[in-house]
Amino acid sequence: MRKPTARIVFSLTLIVLAVGFLFPLWLAVRNGFVSPDGQFTLRYLTGVFRNPVYLEGLLNSLRIAAGTTLLATLFALPPAWLSNRYSFAGKTGLNALILVPMILPPFVGAIGFQQILGQYGALNALLGLNIDWLGRGQWAGVILLQSLSLFPVMYLNITAALANIDPAMDEAAQNLGASGFARFRRITLPLMMPGLFAGGTIVFIWAFTELGTPLIMNYTRVASVQVYDALKEIGGNPFPFALVFVMLAVSAGLYFLSKLLVGGRTYTLPGKTATAFQAVRLAGGRAWLVRLPFLLLIMLALLPHFGVILTSFTAPGGWYHTILPQAFTTGNYSEALGHGITVSSIRNSLGFSLLAMIFTLVFGIGIAFVTVRSNLRFRGLLDGLAMLPLAVPGLVMASGYLALSSLLSNLETVRNSPALLNLFDVKTNPTLFLVLAYGIRRLPYMVRSAAAGLQQTSAELEESAANLGASPGVSLRRITLPLITAHLIAGALLTFSFSMLEVSDSLMLAQREEFYPITKTIYELFQLIGTGKYIASALGVWAMLFLAVTLVGSSLLLGKKLGALFRT
């Protein structure tokens, strides 16, 4: 990329990120430090730690995040290690099935989870017991459900870390008489710690700020739900913004610590060329012993999915303290698609997600070109800024957009213009801010996808085209873009599908029924007495199938590089 072009792209993307990301983030933080007379104050921040309700919420969120990260690691580590060490028939299929839990947002899975593990659920009916498997206050259920949904992120990071370890280290220890466990504890585990920490950071941040799952599980004593409830109040309460700052500080601190520990680290012996680990080929009974942990984990992880699917086919009141539903119906699906708010929510989500996908394509490609194809001095700054949304929870971004909307809609020029009010007032029309939220938060996926494609495409092809007289635009259109199309499609699919099922931004920004996205509609339907959870489950199955198709498509296009999109 020519330097003048790179500078223009750099400047434009920097402006967009500053206005659409950094400024709302600053507003979300600022509102927690400004007194009614406009003076700087720490009263609200210290008040968060003095208020026993807020303090309990923070501690519960940290407990859930730590528990989720630990449990997700315990789920992911054994199959990842076995996959690295052994080769057996069906390994490719099992590795694909490991990713299946990602096709269902945890808060949707909570509906099915309660039907199976609730006090009057299927498991108690099978065992003839009356145990609250989800734990007092549902916190144990939140941890288990989020772990089953997020362990694939840990699995992708651990397998990548194991694949990068030079096997010569393990062989040298074996030749010196070290046992298998000793080699794992003293060589493999320390060398894979950066990968563990990278995956654990994403899981921790995700679980720490998750909003939908605690809401569905009716576990309200967590910071995310406290922020959500407080921001719905009229009167401009500053304490939730101070709480948002604390959550942002924890998330960003972990993210940068991860970058510090993981960034640029390799796993090879100095002075030697790393060779691929030769997996041991297994067959017969030994192969089944290795398959068993995969199968048990997949069965456990799919429990929420089965619960949602069965609930979607259950007649209202037809599954109560029984092993299986006693009355089935397909009417939930027709009612879900025919309900007053579901059709518009599907249309809204399709529109919002499509616009977000276009946004990430345009700016993701531009950022990738600047970072990979230019020699600008500050290109690393742009790359780091583009990846920073990974460290910022959706709840925090939504708070920032609410603050930005309030600021803009109170301007006299905006108040006097119906068109501008419709554009900038989230209470009137949240389209602009939902598209921004979806696009900014998924931008890292597109940047990494495009950058991976460019890194695999020789810059000499573009230089040859330039030497033959082709303009940069012609070279981009006829050479570069066709070569990285698969990566762009994969990134676009992930952006589109995860935007369709975004929870925190949708719940907080969509305040009028006519603009509800799918996830907000599922939550609202779940609140209905009687048929609510059955219709919500039917809509959740539709969303699950949609995300499954896009994840499979992205996996086929990216192959093993899919895991790179879920690493810090």
Describe each region flagged by the PLM.
Residues 1-27, 92-98, 247-257, 278-307, ...:
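N-terminal signal-anchor/first transmembrane alpha helix
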Residues 2-5, 45-53, 137, 208, ...:
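Interhelical loop and adjacent transmembrane-helix boundary motif
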Residues 3-10, 90-91, 152, 159-174, ...:
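C-terminal transmembrane helix and the adjacent membrane-cytosol boundary/short C-terminal tail
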Residues 7, 82-113, 170, 184-185, ...:
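Cytoplasmic-entry segments and transmembrane alpha-helices of multi-pass inner-membrane transporters
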Residues 12-15, 70, 100, 144-166, ...:
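Transmembrane alpha-helices
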Residues 42-46, 55, 90-93, 110-147, ...:
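Membrane-interfacial helix termini and adjacent extracytoplasmic/periplasmic loops
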Residues 52-83, 247-261, 339-373:
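Transmembrane alpha-helix signature in integral membrane proteins
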Residues 177, 304-308, 321-326, 330-568:
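C-terminal structured domain segments across diverse proteins
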